[in-house]
Structures are given as C-alpha cells and as structure tokens.
From Swiss-Prot:
It is found in: Virion. Disulfide bonds: none annotated. Its main location: virion. One of its GO terms (molecular function) is nucleotide binding. Belongs to the reoviridae RNA-directed RNA polymerase family. Its EC number is 2.7.7.48. Coiled coil: none annotated. It comes from Micromonas pusilla reovirus (isolate Netherlands/2005). This is RNA-directed RNA polymerase VP2. RNA-directed RNA polymerase that is involved in transcription and genome replication. Following infection, it catalyzes the synthesis of fully conservative plus strands. After core assembly, which consists in recruitment of one capped plus-strand for each genomic segments and polymerase complexes, the polymerase switches mode and catalyzes the synthesis of complementary minus-strands. It comes from the Viruses.
C-alpha cells in the first residue's frame, strides 16, 4: 500500500520530530558500535561483556562527580558490612550472599542443606500443640521456614529417622520413592545441577546487564554533552555507578595485595581506573575485612544422616560450564581470567569468574539497574531521585529477599498522601452507566480530607489519632525515613486538577516500591513448608480448622442453591464438547505427553550425518487433548483420585515482591467435569439483579465500562464524608478453602437431580462423579520436584490452582462472609466481590467508630474460617481499592510493573515491539516521558543485534524505524503499539533523507508450527508416546506404550461431532472429484479434510511447543540463515546478504469495499491547548480563526501522560461496553469452534478459489455443519470487504483508555471539514463498517499527533494538527 506523499508541508512539531529522528539515528549508530565492539560475524560472549563493562566504566568516569563517587562507595561499604553479619545461609529461603575470601579458590559451602518436608513440619507442629511443657516440636516462629534451624532445633540421627526437638521423623534417601512419607530431606544442589539454587541469584532481562549498562550510560553521555541542565542523577546515574563500583570492589578485594592506611578510604575514581587497567589498587580496611574467610554454619544433609551428594562448587561448575559453552576456537584462557565477577550466558544462570568475591554480583548489578530505571521514571516528581537511592541501599543489604518490607515503609505514606487535606476537582454528580462523562463546568472543586484513613492508620500503629503522631510514626525508618518525609512534605497539600496531577504518580511509585526487586525466587525444597499453609499449620498458627462446619455455610448455601437452579443437565456428548473447548487453551496442566525424536527431523536437516536426539514433552492442554482425548473421558480417569503413590504435579509462579508460589495442577478429566458448574456460576454472577456485586463477571474488556462502578463510588465518597469504602483483605482465602466449603457445594449438588445420561456412559451420575472429585480434594496429593532425583509429596486439602471454578468459588466464599457481616452488624452495605478481593460501600452510623466496626468485621471473618487483615493491610477509606486498581476522587491508578520477566526471556530475534509496548505501559503507570524515551532508545539499540550460536547480525536503523519495519512505533514519547498509518502518512517529513531511500530487511520467519509437527509425527504409526493422565501412565496389559497414530485416531473418534462427520462423508467425494479436475491450485487440500482435524491440531500444538521451547535456538538459527542474516556456520568466509523489501508506505488510497479513503493532514486546521485553568480548547480553521471552543471534559485518566489525558479531555470518554475498534469480520469464516489447525484465512482462501456451486461442499469437507454453511454463504460476497477491514486494522493501534473516547466531537469535526456529499458516504447506514474504520483511524492518528506534539513541545501551549479523510466511491 504506497502513498504519494509530500503535498502536506511539515509543521514545526514534525520538523522537531525529524530532527529528533536524526539524533536518534546518530545515537543508534554510535551507541551500537560502542555497545557491540565485536563487529565481525563470529563473537565470543564473555570477551564482549568484559569490553562492555570496561567501556561503561570509562563513560562513568567522564560523567561522575566526586560526590556521586562518594555516595556509591558508601553504599557498597554498607553492603559489605551487612554481608559479614550473616553466617547462616539458611536464615531465609532466599539465595544467600556468600563470601569467598581472597585466598579461597572455591566458595566455602557445597553440601546441601537439611530441609523439613510438609509432613515433617506438620508432625513438629502437632507435637508442640499436644505438649503442655512446650519442649517437643516447634512453635509458630520456627515453623515459618522449611530449613532445620541450627540455632533452635535439636537434631539427632536415629537410624532411618532423624529426631528433631524430640520428634522422630523418617529421613529421605536415594532409595526412597515419593510414596514414602519423609519428614526430613535435603535441598536441591547449590550449584551445577539442572535445578540448582544458583538460578535464584539472577533476574531475567531481555539483554545482558553488560549491554544494558553501557547502552544506558552511553545515552546519558550523549544527552549530557553540551547540556548543563541535563539531570544525569535523575536518570539513575548514581544507581548505575554504584553497580560498577560494586563489581570493581569485588575484583579489587579478591586480587589486591596492598592495603591503605587505617581510616583512609578508597576513591571511587581510582577504583574504576584500576579496574579498567587491570592493576589492583590498595584497598581500605572495610574491603580487607570484607574479603576475610567466613565460617558458615547450617544443618547440612550429612548432619541428618543423608549421604552427601558430592555436588560441584560454584567456581568449579562455572568454569566447566563456561568452557563447555564457549564456541570452538575461542580464547578460553582470557575468559577464565576475566576481571568481571560474572558473565551472562544466553540461557541459564550466570557464570562466576575468579574475580567474584561474593555470590551476589549478578543480583546487585540488576538492582542497581532496576532502581536506575525507577529513578528515571520518577524524575518528574520532587524528592524521588534520593528516594530510589535509598531503595537501592536497602535492597542491596540483603539481596534476594523480597522487597515487600520497603512497601511496608513507603505504602503508608502513599495512603496518607491521598488522605491529607487538599482541594480536588470532581464531577458534581456521578454519571449514568453509559453516558459520556461531564464537561469541566459540571465539575466542582471540593475540600477533601480522609479522616477514616487517619483513624485506621493510627489504630494500626497503636498511636494517638492525629496527623502529627501519624507523621512521626511513618518516618521512623532510619534508612528511608528522611527521603519519605521530604516527599510527603512536598505533596501532602497538593491541589489536584487535570493540569496538576503528579500526586497520582507519587502514590503509584510509593505503593509498589518493592517491584524494583523483580521476580523473586526462593529455595524449591522449602516451598512445601514456606509456600503452603497446611491443615495442621493453619490450626497451629491461626486456630482455624477448615474442616469444621461454621455459621457461614448457611449463607454460602443460598448462593450454591441459586447456582444449581441454573445449571444445564450435562450430557456425555456435552462433556466431549467441553473438552474440545479446553483444547483451545495453550496453558499447562497436570497431564503430559512425551516422545523421543531427533532435532534434524524437526528442522528438516536431511544433510546432517549425526543424530541429535531430544525428548518432545508437553503439558499444554491443546497437545494433550489432541493426542489423548479418549483417555481423558472414561470411567476410570473421571473417578481417579491422587495418592502418595500417584500424586499430581505442581508448578511454580513468581510475582514481584512476593514469595514464590506453588501451583497445584489439575488433570483434564477434573477440568472437564467442572465445565457445566463453571458455566452455571458465570451465568448466575452476570444476573442484573445482583446490582453489579460480582464485578469481574460483568467485565467486557472495556476499561471505562468495567471501572464505572469504582469511579462512581469514589466520586460519591468525595461528596459524602460519611461514606466509606472498606476493602476487606482476605489474602489467605485460598488457603482456607477446605473440606467445609466443599461440603456445602456437595450438598447443593445432591439436592437437585441434574444427571442426563452420565451413568450410562461413565458408570456414575454427574453428581456422583462431582462428589467423588470434590471429596478427593480433601486429601489431594501433589508432587513437587526438588531436582532430578528427589520429589516431595504434599497432602493438600485446599482447592487445586487449575480448577476452572477457583475464582467463582472464592467469590461465593467472599459473598458468604459479606452476607454474614451484614446479618451480624445490621449495617446496610453494597459490596463488590471477585475471588478474594472485596470492598463494601457503607455509611458509618453515628454511634459507631470505623476502627471498632472493622475489628468486628475481622472477628466475623475469623468465625467464618478466614483471616482478614483489613485494619493493618487494606486501603480502606474514601478511596476505592479493588483488583489491583486504586480509584481516588474518580481517578484510576494501576500498579507499577517490574522491569524484568518471570521466566528467562533473553532477546533472540524478531519483533521488539512487545518489549517496547511493555515499557510504554510502565511509563503510563507513573513512569514519565524521560523513562520511556530512555527505554525505547536502549531497546532498539540492543534489539538491533541478532545473535545465535556465536554468530551475529546488526539491523540498520531504517529497518527499525520505517513503517513496515520491525517496530512500527513512533520512537518517542508514549507511542501506540502500532502507528504504521501515522508513520506512513508523515514518512517524508520525519525520516532522514538517506533513510527514505533504504529498504527494510525482512523479519526472519520460523517454520510454520504445523509443518514442524508434521515432521515430528511423520512416523506416527511406530512412534511410541508416553501419555500421563492424572498421574497415571497409559499403557496396555503388557506395559507397551501406544503409538501416536493410534492415539490420534482414537482421539478423533472421541472428539468428532457426528453431524459434522456425516455431512463431511456425504460431500467428501463430490469435493475431491472436483478438486482433482479443477484448474486451480488448492495446495495440499487433504489437510483441509475434517477427518484429519485432530491430527492437524496435534501437529500444530506439538510444532508450536517445539519451536518456542525445546528447539527455539535452532529454529532461530535456521530462520536467520534463511533470511541471509548470518552464515551457515562459524568461520564462514563470505558474509551473507540479507533480503530487503521496500519500506511499506500507503498507496494513494485504502479500500473499504467500494469506498476509497485517503488521509491527509491540513496544517492550518488544529486544536490549541493552553495548560492552565483559565483556557478552554480552541479549534482553528484554515484562516487561522477560532471556529469552535470546547470545554475540557472530566475523565478518570488524569494519572495518564499528558498526551493521553488531554486527548480524552477533548473527546471525553463513555462507559458503554463497546470500544473504538475495527471489528474482525473475517472471524465469521473461522472454524475455531470445531478445529484448531485452521484459521479464517485458510477458509477464505479456499472459498475464493472454489466456484459458487461447490462452496457448500468445500465447507462441509472442512467440517462446517449445514447451519454454519447457510450463515456463511450470506457473507461470502463480502470476503474482499472483510479482508480490506482486516488489513486496515493492521495499520493502527491505541491505548485502551483512548479506545473509550466519545465520538460526538469527532463526528462534529468530520462534518465540518467534509462536504455534505462526501460525509454522506461516511454516514450511509448501509456501511457501518466504513464509519467505524474511519473513526478508529481518525482517533488513532489523532492520538499519535497528540503524542508527537507533547513529546516535542517547548512550551505549555500545544497545537495539535488534525487528520482529514478524503472519501470517494471506487468506480
């Protein structure tokens, strides 16, 4: 689609953006060359990283002041002192800081630590409960960790038992299997093994820390050059400098032979200069102390009589692993002598070098970078540069532990800032559910103070109820108190309006400071104790027995009875369809398929002489169901219960600033049984009679519509000082969902006969099967794999994590508690619930105190069997906190996001757009434009390098920046995820001339998943597959495994729908006879056959898993070689030539059916914004005269960046359930309802080749039924229109908040600039798709124009150029 541009003269903003693009390109080229010193095809990773770290030091030396050096050295000194205080590596479940003295070649610990299993800890707790003397077993404090505490636990070996505090516990040995009830075992290996603890010490970034540091510092250097006003410290420089000083300090402490005089400290500048030269400096006394030998003490595996595993030490493992993964011919000696304490591999944990003094180098270096990003993201806020230095100081003292403690210090300050006396602007009244929000004239400025927050916080601290006492208490923390007080004093009386809304960013940063810690992991072996509250632990620690019947059951029963009245009687046929619906999910579960294959087969490498075997293993639902559906729905599997001998598998989930969590996977037979109940629960909770009580069930994925109740409730709180929102914090609700709660559900199921043929097919009725399953959850057994040889089995009485009904069932529990609270307190309330989240809107009676009321609610919750910490832990008050969103004065605030990823996500090749989208989202949540600009530049520079197996390729700037390239985003400000239309329309105004003349390099394309899967299953009739359903392996009486071919045949017979199958058979030969003689290329049309749908789904699922997980690097390599980006092998003499295409520009027109659209910008028609409270929005015409004046419209997105909130101030927002989007009408041709291997595009392509008289037969050949065919034939004439709309949708994107823009002013403007005849085309009621497309593209272009104007603005007066569509009929 290329468009002849150039008719529009550039505006000043576009000239500035053009200049910025030239600057970006210069930064791109210069920084990339410095960042990637090895420009040849073949690279050595570790040498590259050392060069990068040294260059980062050189940049820091040029930038740093002595004051910054002193601050960085002082932080590292404090860290070193803290390191010497911890001689027990098992004092917490997180990876410890271990010191290796300057004289030691290896870190002084190798033996695994002794660990208590859940079974062992329960026995100790039970012993203490039954021992009046308090000598046997353990108390509550000792039960927090899974390690055996060397200081408080008395351990004796007694044969096959270990006596811990007087309790005999069976110990683990290599001969035990998981069915043995083991009380004492050992942790996973510290290092070396596949599941070694060392992986806890790293965080997952898309690029190496060395690359990230040097890129950020280079960008700071270039921006600071000649600009005295550039705030280098506000961009996180001191934090990064601290990281460099730390790494250099480890090296110096390990290698230095000389000492400074007493009380003489080292200069940071001298330290970095010495590191660059490789000449160790004289070190001060604190470094000398830091590097002295440590005597670590903990209970080891041999201390409890377990034979030591003889694991490798960290230094030994690192050396072997690094040599093993070094490309042939590389300089291995220099790798081992590296000055940097660690090098990062493309996958897996980092390697420690001889320069490493401690185990914390990778983690502390990450913390320095993470807090630098946060510092840059708060540069627009007063006091936060110092705050994030304090955050770094705190996190670095005990790296690896969760940063939740910071939130406990900073979050109260955020809460208080939203409660102190100030003036705020809100609508005079709340809006009806679907109306546009009000103009500014309908707003009022209100004096606001939240005394409820004051009372609750003071009661939590147990101090007098006044602001002075609260302020003194909040700032007691020695390290953080002074900077928090400064921030508080700056903002506590800040007046808030659309032009002055930084307070929302302040609250956002303070609330989620712990996210700077990233995704924290902990010792896997202790998770059964640390990560799960067992039945015994709940009784011992909280006095709650989840088996006992309670008063709340009667309230829950009311809801379950109502749900059962809506349940549709399940049938065996329906169960199959529910299973097929589950197969559309790519999520994992408890069931798995495994088979052996060869890498060369997967890659289609027929010329490879050596075998490269690998095991294809998948627990994704789509692959398991496609291969084994017939094994899932049968009388045996549907009644299967877990046991110690055959437990169910677990997974893990990490959340920023939270402990690692266990996931209790549930087998597919259980999930299919739950489907009818799940649908009934959803239908019940969507009933309008509930007055939106079940909030999430009503959500449409439309941000304003879904938030309207929160917004209105928070506005009501401003107008009514007696109205309060009580956020009941039942964060442990899942852990208390035990037998009692399930018995209520079982009783409700048995009260209503709902069976419909289940007994005939499966031997038991649906009710009996459900009772068996739910009762089985009372003693569910799950295996947790600690490492390759050891797994712990846990007895779990809570609901499995994978249960479809978890959220809805928890909601019923929450509803029961709220109903019980209403009955007991006799205070009317409107509550809103989802899962364990609940808040209630109520007016506090004159004779009641809010603190007393909340304490009463907590007691009632305890009586209901739940722990509710509303007083101390929740955000109750005159703001509304629900589902991670805080709404204050009608304004929404979402939590910040961690910079790292939960799982390894090293950038390899392809689209960096997803990274940029995440970083822009971070910017919109309090991050500011400086942070987004830095992250955008840093990302495109680093993502320009593709690398695999020691070969690399660099993308040129045009391929990244041009429309149709690899990004399609405006490289400044807060760009939309897709700005291809705007970039195409303004391409010649903003791109440097030499860029305009360049093509873009094609994005490497990995093999299609279905082709990969077909290759892997090509020998399906002899390929044996291990299928595990519910923990049991499928095999015949002789123990033989089934073949893939047999599995897929049987699965298809189970999954196929008879009506589709009959119609397929009826028309099969007609279609095949026509296809054999037709003069059209249908490709391999046999793959379209309905009879092959299950095999096709299996091939696609298995191919996807293989390409994305098992063989990702090899498929990346193949794609890059095929695209001409890298050579076939290392050492190749000739450099490949990549394939280029023209930069993708729009044609003169875009087609929407018979209508053509051309977009242009008229430079003389614009909106004018002046950022103060006295001016409205003005629309100017070509004669430079104001023709329309608009008042600002209030909306709930003042926390968003200026470009977004001012656009919405012009349009306003609505709360309707529909949004600005080009509907994907091609979905009408999608076969996703009955087969997963084909897409709508496949069907549309087929229909365009098949003559009209054969279309019905062709569709039945694919598997469509008669009704679907009849409906589809109505749309076949519109295929080209739907394709046009689909292509249009690929040219624009916008933020979710912008999608809710009201269109009345947009429509008014379009009527103003278009002739009546032209507008008539747009307003044709027969063409709703055209009108929708124009509106979407207009608002998308307008949002991009707002972004550019605000990003390039030099004053508070902004002019926004307006896009204009030109429409005509296609003759």
């Amino acid at each position: 689609m290329s468009r002849k541009l150039g008719s529009n003269a550039p505006t000043p903003m576009h000239l500035r953006l053009g200049n910025r693009y030239e600057t970006i390109e210069q930064l791109f080229n210069k920084t990339r060359d410095i960042n990637r010193p090895n420009k040849q095809q073949d690279v050595e990773i570790a040498n590259t990283q050392e060069t990068q770290w040294m260059h980062a030091c050189k940049l820091a030396l040029d930038l740093a002041t002595e004051e910054q050096f002193e601050r960085a050295v002082s932080i590292v000194k404090e860290w070193s002192i803290e390191d010497r205080k911890h001689d027990n590596p098992t004092e917490s479940s997180y990876f410890p800081v271990i010191i290796r003295s300057s004289k030691e070649a290896e870190f002084p610990f190798k033996e695994r630590s002794a660990v208590l299993t859940q079974y062992g800890m329960d026995a100790l707790l039970e012993a203490r409960l039954n021992d009046p003397s308090g000598k046997r077993g353990v108390d509550a404090e000792e039960s927090k960790l899974g390690f055996i505490n060397i200081e408080t636990m008395n351990v004796k070996i007694n044969g096959d038992y270990v006596t811990v505090n007087g309790v005999d516990l069976p110990k683990w040995s290599a001969d035990n299997d998981a069915s043995a009830k083991v009380g004492v075992t050992c942790s996973e290996a510290w290092f070396g093994a596949r599941d070694a603890r060392w992986t806890e010490a790293c965080r997952h970034l898309p690029f190496s820390l060395a690359s990230t540091y040097v890129t950020w510092l280079m960008l700071l250097t270039e921006q600071a050059a000649g600009n005295d006003k550039f705030n280098i410290d506000g961009h996180g420089f001191t934090n990064l400098l601290t990281g460099l000083i730390y790494l250099a300090s480890e090296w110096a402490t390990r290698t230095s032979k000389s000492r400074l005089k007493k009380n003489v400290d080292i200069k940071g500048r001298v330290l970095l200069e010495s590191w660059i030269k490789g000449n160790p400096p004289a070190i001060p006394s604190w470094m000398d102390d830091w590097g002295k030998p440590m005597k670590y003490k903990y209970v080891t595996e041999s201390d409890v009589g377990i034979k030591p595993h003889n694991d490798k030490g960290l230094a030994e493992w690192s050396k072997e692993a690094q040599l093993r993964n070094t490309p042939e011919g590389a300089d291995t000696e220099s790798l081992l002598r590296s000055r940097i304490p660690f090098t990062e591999a493309d996958s897996g944990p980092p390697y420690i070098t001889d320069s490493a003094l401690t185990t914390s180098g990778p983690l502390r270096a990450f913390l320095c970078y993470s807090t630098a990003v946060e510092c840059c993201g708060s540069i627009h806020l007063r006091g936060f540069t110092e705050y994030y230095k304090c955050v770094l100081h705190y996190l670095g003292t005990q790296p690896g532990k969760i940063g939740k403690q910071i939130s406990k210090v900073s979050s109260p300050v955020a809460r208080a800032l939203g409660a102190t006396s100030k003036e705020v602007m809100v609508p005079r009244r709340v809006q009806p559910s679907e109306h546009v929000w009000c103009d500014e004239t309908d707003c009022v400025t209100v004096k606001f103070e939240d005394n409820y927050v004051l009372q609750l916080m003071c009661a939590s601290y147990d101090i007098p109820t006044n602001w002075e006492s609260l302020e003194n208490k909040m700032f007691e923390n020695e390290l953080m108190g002074h900077c928090l007080r400064h921030i508080y004093d700056e903002y506590k009386h800040e007046h808030v309006n659309i032009h002055n809304s930084d307070l929302f960013d302040v609250i956002t940063h303070l609330t989620n400071a712990g996210s700077a810690e990233g995704y924290v992991r902990s010792c896997l072996a202790t998770l059964p104790v640390d990560g799960y509250m067992s039945h015994m632990k709940r009784i011992a620690l909280e006095g709650i027995d989840s088996s006992e019947d309670k008063e709340v059951s009667q309230y829950e029963r009311v809801h379950w009875d109502a749900i059962m009245r809506t349940i549709l009687p399940p049938t065996p046929e329906g169960a199959v369809q529910e299973l097929k619906a589950l197969s559309n999910s790519r999520s994992g579960g408890a069931d798995r398929i495994r088979f052996k294959s060869d890498r060369n087969t997967a890659l289609a490498n027929s010329d490879r002489e050596t075998d490269a075997p690998f095991v294809m293993s998948s627990n994704r639902k789509n692959s398991t169901i496609a291969m084994a559906a017939h094994l899932i729905l049968n009388p045996v599997t549907l009644k299967h219960r877990s046991s110690y001998e055959v437990p169910l598998p677990t997974g893990i989930r990490s959340v920023p600033a939270r402990i690692l969590r266990l996931i209790y996977n549930m087998p597919l037979p259980m999930q299919s049984l739950l489907q009818p109940l799940y649908k009934a629960m959803k239908a019940y909770m969507k009933r309008p009679t509930h007055n939106e009580r079940y909030q999430l069930a009503l959500n449409k994925g439309v941000v304003v519509h879904d938030s309207r109740t929160l917004i209105n409730n928070s506005i009501n709180c401003v107008h009514n000082p007696r109205l309060v929102s009580i956020a009941d914090d039942a964060s442990k609700l899942d852990q208390h969902e035990g037998p009692r709660a399930r018995n209520v559900l079982i009783d409700a199921l048995e009260a209503i006969p709902i069976d419909n043929g289940f007994a005939d097919e499966f031997g038991d009725s649906y009710t009996d099967l459900m009772r068996n399953m739910l009762a089985g959850w009372n003693t569910n057994y799950f295996a947790f794999n600690v490492d390759a040889e050891q797994k712990q089995v846990m007895s779990v009485d809570t609901d499995p994590s994978g249960a479809l009904i978890t959220a809805e069932k928890n909601t019923v529990t929450s509803a029961g508690i709220q109903d019980m609270i209403i009955a007991r307190t006799n205070i009317p309330q409107r509550d809103y619930l989802w899962g364990d989240d609940a808040y209630a809107m109520l007016t506090i009676p004159d004779d009641r105190n809010i603190v007393e009321l909340i304490r009463e609610r907590e007691v009632i919750a305890t009586d209901a069997g739940q722990v509710m910490d509303t007083l101390n832990g929740s955000w109750s008050g005159r703001g509304v906190h629900f589902l991670q969103v805080y709404t204050l004065w009608g304004q929404r605030m979402k939590r910040r996001t961690a910079i790292d990823h939960e799982n390894p996500a090293r950038y390899s090749m392809g689209d960096s757009g997803s990274l940029l989208t995440k970083y822009v989202m971070m910017g919109t949540r309090g991050g500011g434009i400086q942070m987004t600009n830095m992250l955008i530049l840093s990302t495109i520079i680093q993502a320009s390098r593709f690398k695999v197996f020691g070969r690399q390729f660099f993308l040129p700037f045009p391929t990244i920046a041009a429309p149709g390239g690899h990004v399609n985003m405006i490289l400044t400000g807060f760009p939309a995820p897709n700005s291809k239309l705007w970039l195409s329309t303004n391409y010649h105004h903003i791109m440097p001339q030499h860029v305009k003349d360049r093509g873009v390099i094609k994005r490497p394309a990995v093999d299609q998943p279905e082709h990969i899967g077909a290759r892997l299953l090509s020998e399906k009739d002899t390929l044996e597959v291990k299928v595990t359903i519910g923990g049991a392996v499928a095999q015949d009486a002789e123990g033989n495994l089934p073949t893939a071919g047999d599995l897929m045949k049987r699965a298809h017979r189970k999954l196929r729908e008879q009506t589709r199958h009959d119609l397929y058979k009826k028309n099969k030969h007609k279609f095949l006879n026509w296809a054999l003689t037709a003069d059209v290329d249908l490709g391999d049309y046999s793959k379209l056959a309905y009879s092959r749908s299950t095999q096709g789904a299996a091939e696609k699922a298995i191919g996807t898993q293989t390409a994305e997980k098992h063989l990702k690097k090899w498929f990346d390599e193949k794609a890059m070689v095929r695209a001409g980006l890298i050579s076939v092998a290392r050492g190749a003499a000739d450099a490949p030539i990549p394939e280029e295409t023209e930069s993708l520009l729009l044609n003169d027109t875009m087609h929407v059916g018979k209508v053509r659209i051309a977009w242009r910008f008229d430079n003389d028609i614009y909106l004018k914004f002046k950022h103060d409270e006295k001016h409205n929005i003005l629309l100017f015409n070509k004669a430079m005269n104001p023709v329309k004046e608009y008042k600002y419209r209030w909306h709930p997105f003042w926390s968003q960046p200026k470009c977004m909130k001012m656009l919405l101030a012009y349009t306003g927002v609505h709360a309707r359930p529909n949004v600005l989007t080009i509907k994907d009408l091609t979905a009408k041709f999608s076969p996703h309802r009955f087969r997963a291997d084909l897409h709508a595009e496949d069907i549309m392509g087929l229909l365009k080749k098949v003559p009209t008289h054969m279309q019905a037969q062709a569709l039945s050949f694919v598997g469509f039924d008669s009704h679907e065919i009849e409906e589809m034939q109505k749309h076949i004439p519109k295929i080209h229109l739907y394709e046009d709309l689909s292509e249009l949708d690929d040219y624009s994107g916008m933020d979710d908040s912008v999608k809710c823009a009201e269109l009345d002013r947009i429509t008014e403007f379009l009527q103003m600039v278009m002739s009546d005849a032209t507008y008539g085309i747009l307003d044709d009621p027969e063409s709703p798709e055209l009108r929708s497309a124009v509106h979407v593209q207009f608002v998308s272009l307008l949002a991009d124009e707002f972004n550019v104007s605000y990003a390039c603005a030099c004053s508070n007066e902004i002019r926004i150029r307006l896009p204009i569509p030109e429409l005509s009929y296609d003759v």
